[in-house]
Regions:
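Acyltransferase donor/substrate-recognition loop-hinge adjacent to the catalytic core
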Residues: 3-6, 151-230
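Acyl-donor binding region in acyl/amide transferases
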Residues: 83-165, 281-364
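TRNA-binding/sensing appendages of the translation machinery
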Residues: 2-44, 112
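A conserved beta-strand-loop-helix scaffold within acyl/acetyltransferase catalytic domains
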Residues: 24-66, 76-84, 204, 209-312
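Catalytic cores of nucleotide-enabled group-transfer and carboxylate-activating enzymes in metabolic
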Residues: 14-17, 36-40, 44-48, 55-73, ...
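Alpha-helical subdomain
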Residues: 50, 78-81, 279, 360-363, ...
């Protein structure tokens, strides 16, 4: 490491934003497990006017430089909805990538100073930029590429963040299992019981009614997750924005809604691991990769599928009915995933480490933890 000092400067220009996004390619250029994100999506995430998150939040981005070379980046953000749901004075930082400990210390100190100036008394991180984007630092599973919409980090970051005085706030866990040969007599009996119950209907979504289905699912999500740690509601604008991004990877057979007496009470969203389809694009969609990706998405056959979101109406939490609906949705989706999409591995998560209800579902026979992410906190 050079003895030259680290300087921190805010991201101001379009050129700065490009450098901020492109820096990840320098950090992970020799990491075979890293999957380059689509640059257009990262630019959209951090740009006011594109990401509706900025309608209720503000963020500052910085670059760390040494001798004219970029050696780190970070964001700090204040979200009005986080204030409402996680406590007044709660600020966050994220988008954290560095080449060395000196840059890490300087960037974290800078982010903390900005948060204090905004009146924050507590920092959570890394969260990039909200709980619905990429929360947490990967602390287990570095050797395996992340699935769609999950982060990947250098093992050294854990020590750097803890050296800055941060302690664990919460761990987020993902599980994986071989979905080709999954069977369990107890679960099979529960599913059979549900199939005999005429009140229950498990249906696929209808993509031709995409906006209507998206609103239904996200309303269920806001109800099902509202008591969870870290929960912040999605606004109507964010629902539309998320729907637009997710639409190309939504397939009728992979998204299920459970109804009881005609009322939607649970859902499960499963997506192909788009990282398998984009890794060789190196983050670039244009001019030719866009067509290549569209072709791959016509009928994607990925080895891995991910369940990023699953929820059961709050009124059914801790009931036998909740488990029954969950396992019915899992089984019906599993069958189609294997038969129609050629999938062999399923990933559930992320799941809060203390969400016993979801953990009891995710800990299926043969399932194991494949990634663990940690959100840290510190009093300012």
């Amino acid at each position: 490491m050079s003895s030259a000092p680290v300087t921190i400067r805010p991201v101001v220009t379009k050129k700065d934003r490009k450098a901020f996004v492109d820096f990840a390619w320098e950090v992970y250029k020799n990491d075979p497990a890293w999957v380059p994100p689509l640059k257009d999506e990262v630019h959209g995430l951090i740009t006011p006017g594109k990401n509706p998150w900025f309608e209720h939040a503000k963020a500052q981005l910085w670059l760390a430089e040494r001798g004219g070379k970029i050696v780190g980046r970070i964001s700090a953000q204040v979200d009005e909805l986080v204030q409402d749901h996680m406590g007044q004075g709660t600020g966050q930082w994220g988008m954290f990538e560095v080449l060395d400990a000196q840059a890490a210390e300087a960037l974290i100190v800078t982010a903390e100073q900005w948060l204090r100036q905004q009146g924050m008394t507590r920092a959570l991180g890394p969260i990039s930029l909200s709980i619905w984007d990429e929360p947490g630092l990967e602390i287990e599973g570095f050797e395996q590429p992340p699935t769609a919409m999950m982060g990947h980090h250098r093992p050294e970051y854990e020590g750097m963040i803890e050296a800055a005085g941060y302690e664990k706030a919460k761990d987020l866990i993902t599980y994986e299992l071989d979905i080709r040969h999954w069977e369990d007599p107890k679960i099979d009996r529960l599913i059979a019981m549900g199939e005999r119950n005429e009140q229950i209907r498990i249906r696929m979504v209808d993509k031709s009614k995409f906006n209507e289905e998206a609103r239904l699912i996200l309303n269920l999500l806001n109800d099902a997750w509202s008591n969870n740690w870290g929960y912040v509601p999605l606004t109507e604008a964010e629902i539309k924005y998320a729907g637009k991004k997710l639409r190309p990877i939504i397939f009728n057979e992979l998204v299920r809604v459970a109804e009881v007496d005609g009322e939607p009470v649970a859902f499960m969203l499963t997506i192909p691991d788009i990282n398998e389809l984009t890794k060789d694009l190196n983050g670039e969609l244009f001019p030719f990769n866009f067509i290549k990706l569209l072709w791959r998405l016509r009928k994607p056959r990925t080895r891995r599928l991910r369940v990023p979101l699953m929820g059961v109406a709050k009124k059914l939490h801790h009931t036998r009915m909740a488990s029954m609906l969950a396992f019915m949705m899992i089984e019906y989706t599993r069958r189609d995933a294997v038969a129609k999409y050629g999938a062999s591995v399923g990933e559930f998560g992320w799941i809060l480490e203390d969400n016993k209800g979801m953990l009891s579902i995710a800990e299926l026979p043969g399932a194991h933890v494949n990634h663990r992410y940690r959100v840290y906190e510190k009093a300012l």
